[in-house]
């Protein structure tokens, strides 16, 4: 077992002068200097954070300073609780209060700092720049800090979910889980150990992927981490070419924008060897463009938060929902009452020995440990899947996203995949809204391409001409300028449902010409 500190300490001994971090301004830290900086900063900060093994809020986006701060706090035996700076100040302060944190480091946002001080006056709040000042970290005389404890079950880091269904929930990552969260980039994504690795830091550090699978993997594999503070497709394209990036982890939204930039610039990106994506369903049209304009092996990852990586598929050339179980996990396809045969759509449960531990709002770390066994027994069954005889698993969607209309199960991804190919459609999300007669009604929320035009009637005709079953056609269309999304580019479906339920501007299309079955409580079919 290796902690994050141990993995980076060994990398220092192997390649002491390798550039570990590079940012857009071409500021560089070699791996040895990064280790020394975090060690010195940890010593300098010890007076402010004398409580090892306690969670401590870190509110920051991607930056060299954020990397140094998190590594220093980890070196200091604190438990960095990384938070999304795009959350509202009131939400961040509430997370600090409910997490019972006594310290917070904030990336120079006066509003957030004031909100924390107001909500929890006892919290010591420090600006990130006051903790870390680039290369001007003060040298500290005296004895060096002892190595961080290596108790397997001790909390190492806290990450928060994307908050698609409300205030984000904390996930505590124990020390023993760090190594596997890095190594899966080798076992599933094909990343090889060596100083040839130049990894693009596109994913946010406050997400488990952005921290473990991108930052720590790049440095622990003796490579270089290229910081991306703000995503702009044109600037990222230039950064990839300038730094000769060999690997990147991105969301479908990132890749969609990047393929457009590559096409417009006529770039080739010949240095890219590995492209891994997750965070949302990959539309077929975007996947085709990714394979056309972006080189390197493509890997689709599913389940990075709940079970580190429960499913994946390498050499992706077709619809991105056909996947296989990952090296560190086993998958059962179940329903209430037991397992099911291959070919039947039902719920996936992933088992992973070092699965995350859920952190309830009011729970302390002690209470958290008491919940660990029950969480392991519960599994992480949230995906509707079909497994074929070869062991391939097709992810149809999430259990809580499934629409039940007139007794029929409708998976949003089935409808979204059809509509995504319609002329003029840039993005589409299908949701179910309450319907007095049918329980739920299918609604398509559509973002059009710049300059494009479309109507509910045209999109409905497109669905009628497709292979989509008639009862699955959307009954309403809502045209939006943009979709509400989290920092991981996941659509915030609850916000979308609230918006659609409150609006009367949705275009309504005719009911289907064919009959749809619905079911009475007795189980007898009723013609629709």
Swiss-Prot record:
GO molecular function, a single term: 4-chlorobenzoate-CoA ligase activity
Where are the bilayer-spanning segments?
Answer: none
Q: Which reaction does it catalyse?
A: 4-chlorobenzoate + ATP + CoA = 4-chlorobenzoyl-CoA + AMP + diphosphate
The annotated pathway is: Xenobiotic degradation; 4-chlorobenzoate degradation; 4-hydroxybenzoate from 4-chlorobenzoate: step 2/3
Which residues are noted in the entry as ATP-binding? 161-169, 300-305, 409
Q: How is its activity regulated?
A: Unaffected by 5,5'-dithiobis-(2-nitrobenzoic acid), 4-chloromercuribenzoate and sodium azide. Inhibited by Cu(2+), Fe(2+) and Zn(2+). Unaffected by Na(+), K(+) and Li(+).
Cofactor(s) needed: Mg(2+)
EC top class, as a word: ligase
Which EC number(s) are documented for this chain?
A: 6.2.1.33
Keyword field:
ATP-binding, Ligase, Nucleotide-binding
What Pfam families does the entry give?
AMP-binding, AMP-binding_C
Q: Tell me the GO BP annotations in alphabetical order.
A: fatty acid metabolic process
Q: Which Gene3D superfamilies match?
A: 3.30.300.30, 3.40.50.980
Q: How does activity depend on pH?
A: Optimum pH is 8.4. 85% of activity remains at pH 9.0, 54% of activity remains at pH 7.0.
The record, for InterPro entries, names: AMP-bd_C, AMP-bd_C_sf, AMP-binding_CS, AMP-dep_synth/lig_dom
Q: How does activity depend on temperature?
A: Optimum temperature is 35 degrees Celsius.
User: So what family is this one in?
Assistant: Belongs to the ATP-dependent AMP-binding enzyme family.
Role summary: Catalyzes the formation of chlorobenzoyl-CoA via a 2 step reaction. First 4-chlorobenzoyl is adenylated by ATP, followed by acyl transfer from the 4-chlorobenzoyl-AMP intermediate to CoA. Benzoate, 4-bromobenzoate, 4-iodobenzoate and 4-methylbenzoate also act as substrates. Inactive towards 4-aminobenzoate, 4-hydroxybenzoate, 2-aminobenzoate, 2,3-dihydroxybenzoate, 4-coumarate and the aliphatic carboxylic acids palmate, caproate, laurate and butyrate. Negligible activity is detected when ATP is replaced by UTP, CTP or GTP as cosubstrate.
**What is said about its interaction partners and assembly?**
Homodimer.
- What protein name applies here? 4-chlorobenzoate--CoA ligase
Q: Which organism is it from?
A: Pseudomonas sp. (strain CBS-3)
């Amino acid at each position: 077992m290796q902690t994050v500190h141990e993995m980076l300490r060994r990398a220092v001994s192997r390649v002491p002068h390798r550039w570990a971090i590079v940012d857009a301004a071409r500021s560089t830290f070699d791996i040895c200097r990064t280790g020394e900086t975090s060690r010195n900063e940890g010593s300098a900060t010890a007076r402010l954070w004398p409580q090892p093994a306690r969670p401590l809020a870190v509110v920051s986006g991607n930056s060299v300073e954020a990397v140094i701060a998190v590594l220093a706090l980890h070196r200091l035996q604190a438990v960095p609780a990384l938070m999304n700076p795009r959350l509202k100040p009131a939400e961040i302060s509430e997370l600090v209060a409910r997490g019972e944190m006594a310290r917070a480091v904030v990336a120079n946002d006066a509003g957030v700092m004031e909100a924390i001080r107001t909500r929890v006056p006892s919290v010591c709040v420090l600006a990130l720049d006051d903790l870390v000042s680039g290369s001007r970290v003060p040298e500290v005389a005296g004895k060096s800090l002892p190595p961080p404890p290596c108790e397997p079950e001790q909390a190492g880091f806290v990450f928060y979910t994307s908050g698609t269904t409300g205030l984000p929930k904390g996930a505590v990552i124990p020390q023993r889980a760090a190594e596997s969260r890095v190594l899966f980039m080798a076992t599933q994504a094909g990343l090889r150990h060596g100083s040839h690795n130049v990894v693009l830091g596109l994913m946010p550090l406050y997400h488990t992927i952005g921290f473990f699978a991108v930052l720590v993997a790049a440095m622990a594999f003796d490579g270089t981490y290229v910081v991306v503070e703000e995503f702009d497709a044109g600037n990222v394209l230039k950064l990839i070419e300038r730094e000769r990036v060999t690997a990147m982890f991105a969301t479908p939204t990132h890749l969609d924008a990047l393929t457009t930039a590559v096409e417009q610039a006529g770039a080739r990106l010949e240095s890219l060897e590995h492209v891994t994506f997750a965070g949302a369903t990959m539309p077929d049209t975007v996947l085709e463009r990714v394979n056309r304009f972006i080189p390197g092996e493509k890997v689709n990852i599913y389940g990075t938060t709940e079970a580190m990586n429960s499913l994946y598929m390498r050499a992706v050339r077709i619809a991105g929902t056909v996947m296989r179980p990952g090296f560190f996990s086993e998958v059962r396809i179940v329903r209430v009452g037991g397992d099911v045969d291959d070919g039947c759509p039902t719920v996936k449960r992933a088992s992973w020995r070092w699965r995350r531990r859920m952190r309830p709002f009011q729970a302390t770390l002690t209470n958290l440990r008491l919940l660990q066994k029950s969480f392991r027994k519960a599994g992480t069954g949230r995906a509707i899947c079909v497994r074929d005889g070869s062991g391939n698993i097709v992810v149809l969607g999430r259990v809580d996203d499934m629409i039940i209309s007139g007794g029929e199960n409708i998976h949003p991804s089935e409808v979204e995949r059809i509509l995504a190919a319609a002329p003029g459609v840039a993005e589409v999300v299908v949701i179910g809204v309450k319907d007095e007669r049918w329980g739920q009604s299918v609604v398509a929320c559509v973002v059009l391409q710049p300059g494009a035009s479309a109507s509910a009637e045209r999109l409905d005709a497109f669905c009628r001409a497709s292979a989509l079953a008639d009862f699955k056609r959307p009954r309403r269309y809502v045209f939006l300028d943009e979709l509400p999304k989290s920092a991981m580019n996941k659509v915030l479906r609850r916000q979308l449902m609230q918006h659609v339920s409150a609006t009367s501007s949705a275009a309504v299309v005719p009911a289907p010409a064919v009959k749809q079955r619905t079911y009475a409580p007795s189980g007898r079919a009723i013609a629709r």
